[in-house]
Every structure is written in C-alpha cells, then in structure tokens.
Amino acid sequence: MNQKTIEKNVSERVSNLKPHASPEITNEIESCMPDLGSLEAKQWIGVQNPNRIEVLQELRRSTVARVGTGRSGPRPRTQALLRFQADHSRSKDTVLKEVPTEWIEKQGLLEVQSQVSDKNLYLTRPDLGRKLSANAVETLLTQCKTAPDVQVVISDGLSTDAITTNYEDLVPPLLKGLEQAGMCIGTPFFVRYGRVKIEDQIGELLKAKVVVLLIGERPGLGQSESLSCYAVYQPTVEKTVEADRTCISNIHRGGTPPIEAAAIIVDLAKNMLEQQASGIALSR
C-alpha cells in the first residue's frame, strides 16, 4: 500500500467520525448546572436514590453546612466540588476587596487609616493595623467629640462584605438605641485597614469610657458577611489585654441578625458603664 492510499484511507475515516456531542447537546448539559450561588444550588441534594429525600431536604434547609452532598466513588460529586471552589473564591475575594470611598461618604462617615498603606501590607503586617497613622491621630483630635460615654468605630477588618452588607441594619439602630438610653455618643468614623487592638489607641486618644468596634470577621467558607463587635471599657494601649474585651461575633443575617445585635450592644454598653468593667471582669 503506497503513501497516497494510506493518506486517502485515513482521510476517509476521519471524515466519517462523529463528534462526541453536538453543540446543542453541549449547551443543554451546561444549562442543567444551576447558578452556584443560587438557593437551588445551596439546597442541592447529591445523595443518589435516598430512602427519604424529604428528610435530607429539611436538613439542607436548616443548615449551611455541607451535608447531603453525596459521593462518586471515593470522590465528591462535581457540583459539590464546584460549590466548594466557588465559596472558597468568594471568601478570598472579600478579604482582598476594598471598601469604596464613595460608600463611606454616602454613610456620612469620617474616614481615617491605620499605619497600613495597602491591602497586601495589611495581610502581612498585622501589627501596623493596630496603630493609627499620624494623619489619623490629628484628624480624630480635631474632628471628633472627646470624652464620650460610647465611641462607635467601624473597620473593614478581614471582610469588606461584612461592613457594606450589615451597616444599614446595624449602625443606625445602634446609634439610636444608645441615644435613647441617655448615653453621650462620640463621632462615628471608619478606620481603613484596622485590627481589633486599634480601639485601645482610639479610646485613649478620645478619652472614651466605652469603645465599640464593629469589624469584619475573617470569612468562613462561603460566609463572607459575618461581623464582630469588640467592646471595651476605658481602654489604654499599655494596659488593655484581650481578656478585657467583650466580643459579640457572627453578626449577619444567617447568625445574629444585625438589628438584634444592635439591641444587644446597647445593653452591653449600659452594663459596662454601670459596672465600670468589660471582658471577664463584667458580671453577666
């Protein structure tokens, strides 16, 4: 058999081959995959042929944990793996995102910054996030009320989404509640690239009796909107330790609702002022 005959036979066989799937079939398969962020995807049952599917459905509706995702041999199902990767990406994104300056201005907040200059430095040098920049110190001394009963501070922390998502349901009711309780409220402001301990310098600088820091939590897998409140009585840079802080964590729509957290923080501030204590020294 000569070379031309071989090439002709190969060409004929290739032309007779059928594609594995037509574009129509491929599109149909792709359209079957739900949006990974949708409620349908979150409540998806991956267990094949379950005995009582209604029990699994109720379990999936009652928790955000990864239950009922099923297996394919020793491996996770494709959709379960894709959701895992999507949730992981979402958590990374909220750490790296910046709170827009336009959003801060819209809320009418004064903005200051820690000694951190950018997000990369914030993640690699947490010590700098615990201190105010020189410009921030000057700004707070000239534009903020001194010696308040309660100073409310908002900071991005490790979750931008936690601040932008929960702010409207948390901060206005909190300020209103503190005012109705008869407390003198300091000027609320936003600290970019802040860490928890920065509230000690703020309290010492403004001579606040109670400092309430609302800061974005390190995100969990797929949960990027969780906020924490760290409240402390008469903090100082040198003497305040972590045991002096009272923490209310997991503030978001799927945890402690923001509006409910506002009421809890108001009661907490009242107790701190009455007992002149916070953290482990505060009686429940």
Curated annotation (Swiss-Prot):
Job description of the protein: Catalyzes the deamination of various vicinal amino-alcohols to oxo compounds. Allows this organism to utilize ethanolamine as the sole source of nitrogen and carbon in the presence of external vitamin B12.
Subcellular location: Bacterial microcompartment
Gene Ontology cellular component annotations, sorted alphabetically: ethanolamine ammonia-lyase complex; ethanolamine degradation polyhedral organelle
UniProt entry keywords in alphabetical sequence: Bacterial microcompartment, Cobalamin, Cobalt, Lyase
Family: Belongs to the EutC family.
InterPro entries (UniProt xref): EutC, EutC_C
Lyase in keyword set: yes
Pathway(s) the chain acts in: Amine and polyamine degradation; ethanolamine degradation
Endpoints of the signal sequence: none
Swiss-Prot/TrEMBL GO biological process terms: amino acid metabolic process; ethanolamine catabolic process
Cofactor dependency: adenosylcob(III)alamin
GO MF, one example: cobalamin binding
Keyword Lyase appears in the UniProt entry: yes
Annotated transmembrane regions: none
Protein name: Ethanolamine ammonia-lyase small subunit
Pfam families attached to this UniProt entry: EutC (PF05985)
Taxonomic superkingdom: Bacteria
Cofactor comment text: Binds between the large and small subunits.
Residues involved in adenosylcob(III)alamin binding: 196, 217, 247
Catalytic activity: ethanolamine = acetaldehyde + NH4(+)
EC number: 4.3.1.7
Record NCBIfam families: PRK05465.1
Subunit-level organization: The basic unit is a heterodimer which dimerizes to form tetramers. The heterotetramers trimerize; 6 large subunits form a core ring with 6 small subunits projecting outwards.
Source organism: Photorhabdus laumondii subsp. laumondii (strain DSM 15139 / CIP 105565 / TT01) (Photorhabdus luminescens subsp. laumondii)
